[in-house]
Amino acid sequence: MELFQDVVPQTAENFRALCTGEKGMGDRKPLHYKGSSFHRVIPGFMCQGGDFTAGNGTGGESIYGAKFKDENFIKKHTGPGVLSMANAGPGTNGSQFFICTEKTAWLDGKHVVFGQVVEGMDVVRAIEKVGSQSGQTKKPVKIADCGQLS
């Protein structure tokens, strides 16, 4: 993953720190993606994960507290591999994110794009294959480990 730290530094830092787990405990659980799942996968659209508190898309927590505001909408949902924040409306970013598997221009101005898959798109495509139109996965898809590469 390449994170757009120059364009959306707060959003990129949230994702990076949740990958490393370096911030320790959140409200009730560690602030870490490790062991969490991709709970919503829709082929031809996106793979969504990052809810490490509830595991079903209703939870999540940022390193800044429960939620944080939309930083900006400079980057767009231009195609496969775009990394963007999932939310429940304006200013509700937490830890949930999604990886686009196609261009999703209708999300521009609503979800903050903060990165791009630069290597491993084959893994994203493999995750996409276990999804369904309802978003439910045919089998669990877990983040076995995560961190930061130098």
From Swiss-Prot:
Listed GO biological process terms: protein folding
Domain called PPIase cyclophilin-type: residue spans: 1-148
Keywords: Cytoplasm, Isomerase, Rotamase
Annotated catalysed reactions: [protein]-peptidylproline (omega=180) = [protein]-peptidylproline (omega=0)
MF GO annotations: cyclosporin A binding; peptidyl-prolyl cis-trans isomerase activity
Keyword check for Mitochondrion: no
Enzyme Commission code(s) on record: 5.2.1.8
A single GO cellular-component term on record: cytoplasm
Domain of life: Eukaryota
Cross-referenced SUPFAM superfamilies: Cyclophilin-like (SSF50891)
Record Pfam families: Pro_isomerase
Regulation: Binds cyclosporin A (CsA). CsA mediates some of its effects via an inhibitory action on PPIase.
EC category name: isomerase
Coiled coil: none
Principal location class: cytoplasm
Subcellular location: Cytoplasm
Family (UniProt): Belongs to the cyclophilin-type PPIase family.
Function: PPIases accelerate the folding of proteins. It catalyzes the cis-trans isomerization of proline imidic peptide bonds in oligopeptides.
Protein's name in the database: Peptidyl-prolyl cis-trans isomerase
Species in which this protein is naturally found: Allium cepa
